[in-house]
Amino acid sequence: MMESYDVIVIGAGPGGYNAAIRAGQLGLKVACVEGRETLGGTCLNVGCMPSKALLHASELYAAASGGEFARLGIRVSPELDLAQMMKQKDESVAALTRGVEFLFRKHKVQWIKGWARLQGEGRVSVALADGGHAQLEARDIVIATGSEPAPLPGVPVDNQRILDSTGALELAEVPRHLVVIGAGVIGLELSSVWRRLGAQVTVLEYLERICPGLDGETARTLQRALTRQGMRFRLGTRVVAARSGEQGVELDLQPAAGGATESLQADYVLVAIGRRPYTEGLGLETVGLASDRRGMLENQGQRSAAPGVWVIGDVTSGPMLAHKAEEEAIVCIERIAGHAAEMNAEVIPSVIYTQPEVASVGLGEEQLQAARREYKVGRFPFSANSRAKINHESEGFIKILSDARSDQVLGVHMIGPGVSEMIGEACVAMEFSASAEDLALTCHPHPTRSEALRQAAMDVHGRAMQN
């Protein structure tokens, strides 16, 4: 029997579940097909949320184990209970996934547990998790199948000794030596977790810099900070092979520019070279769709080239970020419902949850220089911010880039304490096409770290008062 819906959403990650919930809010009959045992996709289950739980716990452990607590007059002798740390992480994740289930019930979203395959225009077949099959039809179908860890030739992931990001969140012991392949966001965040818990960490990167998409000045500052924390970086390095055994892994390395092979030993290796869109077995050919050379599905305003098929999140162009997928989900469903909706792709923030944190939105200096666009720069260091200094968290800075003529804010780059919670103000400013002067004229509470943003805006015009 064919079950009919207004909208079928394939995938229940941040893009998929938000699309389904919004469709339900708008009164559409909606089904969400997800084969995982729990809702939330990679982000809630094996990505954003569990990694943040471990980052928070490991940061507290490192503060208690090192000199930070003693400096404040707090003397403790902490003992690591890794099993309990993992348990609280799992409990937090479970609570979040149950929350999505509640929202599905609240907004009358039908969760069909299984794996979807397109069967031509407006039709979807589902291999149900319980072994059966279901046939569905809808006027509109939203593909939100997300992404998976990208493989590295010659380095086979077994999640015993050679790990992907999921495996690195589940280790039952602290590695003696963890080698991380890839100095991007995922690699650096998970490196931070295990370094804080006592592992020796070596980060290998093919390029000559960390975090290729990050503003260069910010990336260099972050690398220096992580190096002081004990991480070792080997840039311009290519991994050509890996052999794992019961006791560890042997890696064969070469200079990226070419040269002699050398060996490196580790007891665990994390492969974190990025992610790729996941569309395997989706039946794209039945609706005339094909992915591009990057594996992504093209879209115009979230519409694919196939009638009635929409794409959001990691399977389409743009940064692979949960909040970007959520934004696309809202735009997609509003358009399906016949409403006007737009997304400003220039105002999608990015955050790295290391210590110090990194956050940015908009264009960087390298991009502006490549475009031959004239711009002004305002900087303010956290070492001159009163709240950061009294908290002994004065590493980093805020940098604002504005148009040389109009003063419109073009990009904001932050590295320092709590900047993940501050970048939102910059996003609002850019969404409203604010100038640096607009930020400079806005009163900020004292003493707060957010004052550094105002001072950076003042510095665009040479008027910073506290540095």
Please identify what each model-predicted range represents.
Residues 10-15, 19-36, 42, 49, ...:
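Flexible, glycine-rich terminal cap/loop adjacent to redox cofactors
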Residues 127-134, 239-240, 252-263, 275:
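A structured beta-alpha segment of the ubiquitous adenosine-cofactor-binding alpha/beta core
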Residues 20, 24, 191, 195-196:
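Gly/Ala-rich phosphate-binding loop of Rossmann-like dinucleotide-binding domains
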